[in-house]
Amino acid sequence: MPEAARGSGKDTVDSDTGSGVDCAFPSTTKTDVCSSNVFVNNFGSVRQGDVVTSHPMTGCGSESPKLSTYSPNVFVNGMGMGRLGDDYEGDGSNVITSGSSNVFVN
């Protein structure tokens, strides 16, 4: 089972495209928005529709993609829970690459 994703900048997201045409790649950003009342290792759980931090590279757009792949049967606040390997774009371009070492989600 994949590791649970944690918000508030705890876990990394690799971006092979960035969010603007002038972005250098590959680049790494962090998880951002998350649940305010369901926690994994004292960090909010990442959920369906939560956004990643803005791309950190100079010249990139400020678009913040939403989590679009997630657990099909574990829910946080009524939304699918994010996991290691889930994607913020749905096309494999903004993938969660770290997660909890002791909480796993189907």
Show which residues each predicted segment covers.
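Intrinsically disordered, low-complexity proline/glycine-rich segments
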Residues: 1-106
